[in-house]
Regions:
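Interfacial helix-cap and linker-helix signal at transmembrane-aqueous boundaries
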Residues: 61-62, 94-95, 182-188
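Conserved MFS/SLC helix-loop-helix module at the cytosolic interface between two early adjacent transmembrane helices
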Residues: 86-122
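Residue-level signature of mid-helix packing/kink "hotspots" within the transmembrane helices
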Residues: 52, 81-89, 174-175
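Cytoplasmic helix-loop-helix junction between adjacent transmembrane helices
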Residues: 133-168
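Helix-loop-helix hairpin linking two adjacent transmembrane segments in secondary transporters
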Residues: 165-209
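Extracytoplasmic
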Residues: 42-66
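Extracellular/periplasmic helix-loop-helix junction of adjacent transmembrane segments
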Residues: 58-85
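Paired small-residue
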Residues: 126-134
């Protein structure tokens, strides 16, 4: 199972315990139809396989850093996965201050920011590592909040259907990102391969227009009912 698939399972199970149909009903009253919200959440999922963007550029990165070992080059890709899991612990702390929709938008923006970094800083391999770390943190925010928002707005069979469509959109997004990165790399070099993350711009706009802002989630201290 891929890291994204594992995260989807984990966050879906976790959020199913935390939300009730009543919560979803209150949030649905903000004027957005279920179809519009579902569309926004599915579009949000397009970047969940964003690590596929770096696979096509690794060979060219290796040529750019001829003294670096193969394992050192591979870290550029694996760092995204390594960062994503521990970064999940940050999201619950943010929920008490920022709405889930805004956390998802921040996560999508972080992926874009991480991808733009090599356009200006790429002379050292650690700069690409930093880029991957930023992308990984952003990915974590998107994965967790996406599944959580689905649990907020949908229940039962409807929720199961949305989760099924989400898996399809993750796959479609991964394919688009990988193909786009490979094409940009072939046409303009490995640095430009990162520009496939510009897909984040319309995604942020779509999230803003289709997903209700929602409310922050107060943290519940241990030992208190």
């Amino acid at each position: 199972m891929t890291i994204t698939g594992w995260l989807l399972m984990y966050s879906a199970t976790d959020t199913a315990k935390a939300h009730t149909p009543e919560e979803g009903g209150r949030k649905m009253s903000q004027g957005k139809s279920k179809k519009v919200i579902a569309a926004g959440l599915l579009v949000m999922s397009l970047t969940m396989a964003c690590n596929s963007a770096l696979a096509p550029i690794l060979a060219e990165v290796g040529k750019f850093f001829p003294d670096a070992s193969d394992s050192a080059i591979q870290i550029v890709l694996t760092l995204i996965n390594l960062v994503t899991l521990p970064a999940m612990i940050l999201e619950p702390f943010l929920e008490s201050k920022i709405t889930k929709r805004d956390i998802a938008m921040i996560g999508t923006f972080l992926m874009l920011a991480g991808a733009l970094l090599p356009q200006v800083l790429s002379s050292q391999l650690w700069m690409l590592y930093l880029s991957s770390i930023i992308i990984g943190v952003g990915l974590s925010f998107v994965v967790v909040t996406s599944s959580s928002l689905i649990s907020d707005y949908f229940t039962g069979l409807e929720k199961s259907r949305i989760m099924g469509f989400q898996s399809i959109f993750v796959s479609i997004g991964g394919t688009i990102i990988a193909k786009g990165s490979g094409l940009l790399t072939a046409m303009a070099g490995w640095k430009r391969g990162y520009l496939v993350f510009l897909i984040a711009l319309p995604i942020i706009l779509i999230i803003l227009l289709t997903v209700p802002k929602g409310e922050t989630t107060p943290r519940v201290e241990k030992g208190k009912g």
